[in-house]
A protein has these predicted regions:
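Lumenal/extracellular ectodomains and adaptor appendage modules
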Residues: 2-203
Length: 203
């Protein structure tokens, strides 16, 4: 099967040109996540910053709900610390990035949100399982390209026994992306208010 190249974001539009997530499972079981988001801001909806919604619960394959415990390490814009605060909603935690007293000029910006999560993976039989919605589906504009990588402690290469992805609206099982030889997952087409969920299993 042929693999289509990712579309580029038009210069006049607002959106995320690249959503690159680096996840590392630490020896203590905490999942360390760095979300590198490349924004094209055009003073349309991105005027002061943005908000990043994260789930407070995740539904396990057996139907039980697990509480996710977050620690926000920090937020940067172009490598410099950026103001942020948390808003709480039913089932969601929002990281509100930016200063409402400061107008963000039009331009291209690299934001990084660094956080850690407890209870993010599940022990299932003789293997561990991570199911993670990489981008969330609450963005008011398109995400043009998504990348996700997962590293295990003290293990090089691709140690996973299963890797999969699911895209679309909640409950859909489309696979709008591909799995690379090194275990990373990348999207194929832009996303708008859709999930990009990855599955990793390892012994």
């Amino acid at each position: 099967l042929s693999y289509a190249e990712n579309k580029e974001i038009p210069s006049y539009e607002e959106g995320i040109s690249l959503f690159d997530v680096e996840a590392t499972l630490q020896p203590d079981g905490v999942l360390d996540i760095k979300e590198n988001m490349h924004f094209q801001a055009r003073s349309q909806q991105i005027k002061h910053g943005f908000y990043r919604d994260l789930p407070r619960l995740w539904m396990q394959p057996d139907g039980d709900a697990a509480l996710l415990n977050y620690h926000i390490v920090g937020v940067t814009r172009d490598g410099i610390s950026e103001p942020w605060h948390l808003d709480w909603h039913i089932g969601l935690m929002s990281i509100v990035v930016g200063d409402k007293q400061r107008f963000l000029p039009q331009g291209d910006y690299h934001y990084q949100i660094h956080y850690q999560v407890k209870n993010a993976f599940l022990r299932e039989g003789d293997s561990d399982l991570l199911i993670w919605n990489v981008t969330g589906n609450h963005w008011p504009f398109e995400i043009y390209k998504t990348l996700f990588s997962l590293k295990l402690p003290d293990i090089a290469g691709n140690p996973f026994s299963e890797i999969d992805l699911f895209t679309g609206e909640e409950g859909d099982t489309y696979r709008n992306g591909r799995i690379l030889e090194d275990g990373r997952i990348e999207s194929r087409d832009p996303f708008y208010r859709e999930d990009f969920t990855v599955l990793y299993r390892w012994p």
